[in-house]
Swiss-Prot record:
Protein residues bound to substrate: K71, N116, R117, M118, G119, F120, N177, N182, N242, T243
Chain residues that bind FMN: A67, G68, F69, D70, K71, T91, N144, N177, K213, T241, G265, G294, Y315, T316
Membrane topology per record: Peripheral membrane protein
Gene Ontology biological process: 'de novo' pyrimidine nucleobase biosynthetic process; 'de novo' UMP biosynthetic process
Active site, per annotation: S180 (nucleophile)
InterPro entries with a match to the protein in the record: Aldolase_TIM, DHO_dehydrogenase, Dihydroorotate_DH_1_2, Dihydroorotate_DH_2, Dihydroorotate_DH_cat, Dihydroorotate_DH_CS
Protein name, entry field: Dihydroorotate dehydrogenase (quinone)
Function recorded in the entry: Catalyzes the conversion of dihydroorotate to orotate with quinone as electron acceptor.
Primary enzyme class: oxidoreductase
Keywords annotated in UniProt: Cell membrane, Flavoprotein, FMN, Membrane, Oxidoreductase, Pyrimidine biosynthesis
Length: 354
């Protein structure tokens, strides 16, 4: 209830400005080790039933912070203390870039959603590498890499490889982002003919698990082709899904006036869940599936786990849910695991579709 009141006040200011304020506050309150430890005792996932080892990495809890919130790895120490089981930083590109002009982030409160056209604004993979070298985190940190906007499509492979080379030794896993709608031509790289050389080259460059992040707007046949390619190349998994360009069924007035961008949150939940189930039926346990998109409650999280997700991610749910959101999700998952007779998280993964 308190956060709802605070959220109403925060929502009076422009979304990106509030993001800067809140992110600075989160870093400040977790900067000192004693305070960070105290927060972790209250919020961090400590129930052993939530822990799992996925693609060789130990995760204390399945819910992670999705890419986009901490683009440059400035909050590495914060996320474990705030209850997340891991965090994915980025998206970063080989070269620093400013992203698209502001305003570029909007709230859709009637839809519990966000619309963004950030355009991969970031300080570059080199700057993130330096920060990861200096920083400390109590949880796994994955990195999400994208294509520099000015890099032509025919040079995309080299662009992704540059980022992978810089970040390889510093990340717990690497996610290749070819699915943001906010970089011109990026989603064209999801076509298997274009995607194959990118994924193969990144995998050859890094010793860490490599995953690919896909869009919810792909056709079912395209999803199947990417899944088959990921298995063929020996990828660790797929992150499903990114934001949607669809405007179907939105309730917030004036959305058309906000312009282009990708929508996250509740409107993408149904399609993200559909894509997850399709992927799990296609690949089973051959790939790790990370589900992201419209997860708001423990019931949502549980549905994704039993539908095949080994790990989960959230961003918009965190914005609307507040600082206790990750803890509430993890506590709910633990309760459902025990209520359903599971002794480990991995036993529950895909149990509804097997």
């Amino acid at each position: 209830m308190m956060y709802r009141v605070l959220r109403r006040a925060l929502f009076l200011a422009p979304a990106e400005r509030v993001h800067v304020w809140v992110f600075a506050l989160l870093r400040a309150v977790t900067w000192a080790a004693p305070l960070r430890a105290a927060l972790a005792r209250l919020l961090a996932p400590r129930d052993p039933i939530l822990a799992s080892t996925v693609f060789g990495v130990h995760f204390p809890g399945p819910l992670g912070l999705a890419a986009g919130f901490d683009k440059n790895g400035r909050g590495l120490a914060a996320w474990g203390a705030l209850g997340f089981g891991y965090a994915e930083v980025g998206t970063v590109t080989a070269q620093p870039q400013p992203g698209n002009p502001a305003p570029r982030l909007f709230r859709l409160p009637d839809d519990h959603a966000l619309l963004n056209r950030m355009g991969f604004n970031n300080e570059g993979a080199g700057a993130l590498a330096q920060r990861l070298t200096r920083g400390k985190s109590d949880i796994p940190i994955g990195v999400n890499i994208g294509k520099t906007k000015v890099t032509p499509a025919e040079e995309a492979v080299a662009d992704y490889v540059t980022s992978a080379r810089l970040l390889n030794s510093l990340a717990s896993f690497v996610v290749v982002n070819v699915s943001s709608p906010n970089t011109p031509g990026l989603r064209d790289l999801q076509a298997v003919a274009a995607l194959r050389p990118i994924l193969a080259a990144v995998k050859a460059e890094t010793t860490k698990p490599v995953l690919v992040k896909i869009a919810p707007d792909l056709s079912d046949s395209d999803i199947d082709e990417i899944a088959d390619l990921a298995v063929e190349l020996g990828l660790a998994g797929i992150v499903a899904t990114n934001t949607t360009v669809s405007r179907d069924g939105l309730l917030t007035p004036g959305v058309a006036d906000l312009g282009p961008g990708g929508i996250s949150g509740r409107p993408v939940a149904r399609r993200s869940a559909e894509v997850l189930r399709r992927l799990y039926r296609r690949v089973g346990d051959k790939l790790v599936l990370i589900s992201v998109g419209g997860i708001e409650t423990a019931d949502d999280a549980w549905e994704r786990i039993v539908s095949g997700a080994s790990l989960l991610q959230g961003y918009t749910g965190f914005i609307y849910g507040g600082g206790l959101w990750a803890k509430h999700i993890h506590d709910g998952i633990a309760g459902r695991l025990r209520a359903c007779g599971f002794t480990t998280l991995s036993e529950a993964v895909g149990s509804a579709v097997r």
